[in-house]
Regions:
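Auxiliary, metal-adjacent structural segments of Zn-dependent hydrolase domains
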Residues: 147-206, 407-418, 422-432
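N-terminal signal peptide c-region/cleavage motif recognized by signal peptidases
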Residues: 14-18
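Active-site scaffold of zinc-dependent metalloenzymes
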Residues: 109-113, 194-226
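Solvent-exposed alpha-helical segments and adjacent loops
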Residues: 23-52, 96-115, 294, 298-525
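Second-shell loop/turn segments in exported
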Residues: 116, 151-159, 218-223, 227, ...
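Active-site recognition of the HExxH zinc-binding catalytic motif
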Residues: 226-246
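Post-HEXXH active-site segment of zinc metalloproteases
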Residues: 242-269
Length: 525
């Protein structure tokens, strides 16, 4: 009875009178994912894969479940995580189970990440412990108590996802799946997952599990329309793409030498082997083509450049081959029919002995491309802020960022940076456009500055923007600035990455945009 009322409160379909097909696409907060997320937090083994945002919801969760920190389900989860049961694996397992507290198997454990949990018996044992955890902690009551909060999250996401993404995918891949569910995961961060459960008729219930990107007014946020569209296309695509290449492991392995030059970039994104990297390349090639077809050439090219900047060196060749698929659908009615042609592209690349220049990823105008560059990392802090106390606190904040995520970086004052050769460096600059003297000198290289200056909202406002390195235009810089020095403190909580700039108030995104190159210079798109 509790489970029924909970799902009635939070499982809301995308409904449009003009497009009934959208009713197939659901958005929910799923008690199974919230349960496993809570256990992940209690293990303290999942690092930045779980959200550390100090919200009422997270405080409620810790208050409720910390007394169960020593439960066998938590201890066993910590062990499993250390052996590879992490990232998407727990999510795949959870969608194979019924809602808590019953957690009954709906699929064979062998199809639910058992191999990453030490085998089917090991996974069954942990699921039994998790069932006991859910009952003893009365997780269902906790979930029901927060149903209003979940409904607010769902409504917020619905307002930013007006399109029938399921139709986009079915049209492109040439096949239909049983169901499509967007799962909002407010306790997760830094990762999104595409998982699936096979029905008796071989069709799939597919899930796109979307992590929170920031918090606004105490409610987890999941990005704007552009971010949600990309994530849904990407995560749902795994359920179409992965089975195709998983069924031909020998053919995929033939081109395994291509992993060597991109090993570091792939491993840093939790794609440690060629099989996984191939699936990721294929998905990103398809989402790039979807952007070209549905959003236009500019959006498609920007998407392709973003994937290339993320280290997916072969995505352009694969996306180019997909044009042949699109133009010959009578010969290739489904993606399944065309998949061997994509494997052949990788075989061809492997035979070429590609030079080092092929793998260079020049600055493409996005924050993400600036931050994924190799080379020494430099953090530039201000010395000329008018608010001295805020300047001191900002330096402390940047030192904290350095200790947590940029441990090998060097911190420079703006004055030191102005006399250094930083042409080979990855740069993060902090402070106001006047108080950081390095930013003050080079602010005209930031195309987003005029947009920031024209914002009408009451401040303080934040701007995170990419810009070219003034000493080497093939490299990028990330500027973390604001209308007041104090507002730069905590700025990493504002979601940023896939676009050229983000303007926000606290952690709420107000405006984003991209750049284009014009006569060798970057300008607003």
């Amino acid at each position: 009875m509790i489970r029924t009322s909970v799902f009635a409160a939070v499982a809301l379909a995308f409904v449009s009178a003009a497009a009934p097909a959208q009713q197939r696409l659901q958005v929910i907060v799923d008690p199974r994912i919230e349960l496993v997320s809570a256990v992940e937090i209690l293990t303290e083994q999942f690092g930045n894969l779980v959200s550390s945002s100090d919200t009422d919801y997270r405080r409620d969760l810790l208050s409720r479940f910390l007394p169960f920190k020593d439960h066998p389900a938590v201890a066993r989860m910590a062990q499993l995580a250390g052996n590879g049961f992490n990232y998407d694996a727990p999510m795949q397992t959870m969608v194979c189970l019924s809602p808590p507290p019953e957690l009954e198997w709906k699929a064979k454990p062998e199809e639910c990440s058992a191999e990453r949990a030490g085998g089917a018996d090991s996974l069954r044992a942990w699921a039994g412990q998790l069932r006991d955890f859910a009952r003893k902690s009365d997780f269902a009551a906790f979930f029901l108590a927060h149903s209003d909060l979940y409904a607010r999250m769902v409504e917020g996401a619905r307002s930013k996802a007006p399109h029938d993404y399921a139709a986009d995918l079915e049209d492109y891949y040439g096949e239909r799946q049983a169901s499509y569910t967007v799962v909002l995961a407010p306790l997760l961060a830094k990762g999104n997952y595409g998982v699936r459960v096979k029905r008796a008729d071989a069709s799939l219930d597919i899930y796109g599990i979307i992590s929170s990107v920031n918090v606004s007014d105490g409610v987890a946020q999941f990005g704007g329309e552009q971010n949600l569209r990309y994530m849904v296309w990407h995560e749902f695509s795994h359920s179409f793409v992965n089975p195709e290449f998983d069924r031909m492991p020998g053919a995929v392995e033939r081109s395994g030498k291509l992993m060597g030059p991109i090993q570091k970039q792939m491993a840093s994104q939790a794609y440690p082997d060629w099989k996984i990297a191939v699936n990721e390349h294929m998905v990103r090639a398809v989402t790039s083509r979807l952007a070209f077809r549905i959003l236009g050439d500019a959006a498609g090219q920007a998407t392709l450049e973003r994937e290339r900047a993320r280290g997916f060196a072969y995505v352009e060749a694969l996306a180019g081959k997909l044009k042949e698929y699109e133009q010959n659908r009578q010969r290739y009615p489904t993606f399944h029919d065309f998949a061997p042609q994509l494997v052949a592209v990788l075989d061809g690349l492997a035979a070429l002995n590609l030079p080092p220049e092929f793998y260079e990823t020049p600055f493409t105008g996005t924050i993400e491309s600036a931050q994924r560059e190799s080379g020494p990392t430099v953090l530039i802090v201000p010395t000329a802020e008018t608010d001295g106390a805020a300047q001191r606190d900002l330096v402390v904040y940047v030192k904290r960022v350095q200790a947590q995520v940029l441990k090998d970086s060097e911190m420079l004052t703006d004055q030191e940076a102005l006399v250094r050769d930083l042409s080979k460096c990855r740069i993060f600059a902090y402070g106001t456009l006047a108080g950081n003297l390095w930013l003050a000198r080079y602010k005209d290289l930031i195309p987003a500055v005029p947009v920031f200056a024209q914002m009408k909202e009451a401040g303080p406002l934040r701007l995170i923007a990419a810009m070219p390195n003034p000493q080497n235009s093939r490299r990028g810089v990330t500027a973390y600035t604001a209308t007041q020095a104090a507002a730069v403190i905590g700025i990493h909580g504002l979601f940023h990455g896939p676009t050229a700039y983000v303007i926000g108030k606290e952690n709420t995104v107000l405006k984003t945009g991209d750049y284009r190159q014009e006569n060798g210079k970057w300008a607003l798109r």
